[in-house]
Amino acid sequence: MSDSIQERYLVGYALAAKKQHSFIQPSLIEHSRQRGIDLVKLDPTKSLLEQGKLDCIIHKLYDVYWKENLHEFREKCPGVPVIDLPEAIERLHNRVSMLEVITQLRFPVSDSERFGVPEQVVVMDSSVLSGGGALGELKFPVIAKPLDADGSAKSHKMFLIYDQEGMKILKAPIVLQEFVNHGGVIFKVYVVGDHVKCVKRRSLPDISEEKIGTSKGSLPFSQISNLTAQEDKNIEYGEDRSLEKVEMPPLSFLTDLAKAMRESMGLNLFNFDVIRDAKDANRYLIIDINYFPGYAKMPSYEPVLTEFFWDMVTKKNHV
């Protein structure tokens, strides 16, 4: 059916320049166009009510004016999906409220697969870090992460802390999370509405009891990534053959988990990082949740996103 007679839908996007460059690829534009969906760039400084007859809005902007703009649009056009609502997104900007999502899930208990989150404590006072009580019941080594998870460079600055000496580099507020050996593999689960895809990535290598006893201080994650094989620097996304033999978590388990998370958070676009406990192959831990991740890195992202857009503009299903 030609574009001239096919019913067409308008999906507006409001993204930061870097995000727009990585996400709005020509291949995605063409995939969507062939399905009858036109992707149009929105001007966040102007009223959304003056930018055409929109059938759906996707966004990843957080300033106050944009939130007010969205609020006005939602009041005047309540039937148009806004993906996603700012108040729902904000929950993921704090690493405590982020993982509380998981602990509060109502999810059927399975004998074969169990899930949870690593033990963690929050330190709000930097003076506590220099003492010996910051860890609570945790034991070294621990992972130190900034409390804020707003996507800034600062929020990605993490450390593996081996001992009390390593704590000196940290500043509050910060989250201290137990380190769980997981075979050096992380599973990144991409959620796009009802669509779920999982990929394997290299992660922090396991730490032996011997190494725990001899390692000192701290290591930033950028250095830890260099501890794995030399050839890692030449490995592109999805091309690490050393991971081929690593078994994926059951897709049915991940799909059910993603659905429960989606409904609990009220979000359609996110990914979550999962590790498998090296001591218990049926125990999975969710360690991070990100809103509107780098979907262009996901294999075959164009048809997945196009199908999601179609679901949204035809009002099939969104939270």
UniProtKB/Swiss-Prot annotation:
Domain ATP-grasp, first and last residues per copy: 99-318
Phenotype caused by lack of the gene: Low inositol hexakisphosphate (phytate) levels in seed tissue.
**Which residues get modified to N-acetylserine?**
2
Matching entries from InterPro entries are given as: ATP-grasp, Inositol_tetrakis-P_1-kinase, InsP(3)kin_ATP-grasp, ITPK1_N
What is this protein's tissue specificity according to the annotation?
Answer: Expressed in siliques.
Q: Which domain of life is it from?
A: Eukaryota
- What binding partners and quaternary form does the record give? Monomer.
Its recorded name reads: Inositol-tetrakisphosphate 1-kinase 1
Briefly state the protein's biological role: Kinase that can phosphorylate various inositol polyphosphate such as Ins(3,4,5,6)P4 or Ins(1,3,4)P3. Phosphorylates Ins(3,4,5,6)P4 at position 1 to form Ins(1,3,4,5,6)P5. This reaction is thought to have regulatory importance, since Ins(3,4,5,6)P4 is an inhibitor of plasma membrane Ca(2+)-activated Cl(-) channels, while Ins(1,3,4,5,6)P5 is not. Also phosphorylates Ins(1,3,4)P3 on O-5 and O-6 to form Ins(1,3,4,6)P4, an essential molecule in the hexakisphosphate (InsP6) pathway.
Tell me the leader sequence span: none
Residues that hold ATP according to the record: 95, 145, 177-188, 203
Cofactor(s) this protein requires: Mg(2+)
Single GO MF annotation = inositol-1,3,4-trisphosphate 6-kinase activity
Q: What is catalysed by this protein?
A: 1D-myo-inositol 3,4,5,6-tetrakisphosphate + ATP = 1D-myo-inositol 1,3,4,5,6-pentakisphosphate + ADP + H(+); 1D-myo-inositol 1,3,4-trisphosphate + ATP = 1D-myo-inositol 1,3,4,5-tetrakisphosphate + ADP + H(+); 1D-myo-inositol 1,3,4-trisphosphate + ATP = 1D-myo-inositol 1,3,4,6-tetrakisphosphate + ADP + H(+)
Q: Where does Mg(2+) 1 bind?
A: 273, 288
Free-text remark on how the cofactor is bound: Binds 2 magnesium ions per subunit.
Protein's GO biological process: inositol trisphosphate metabolic process; myo-inositol hexakisphosphate biosynthetic process
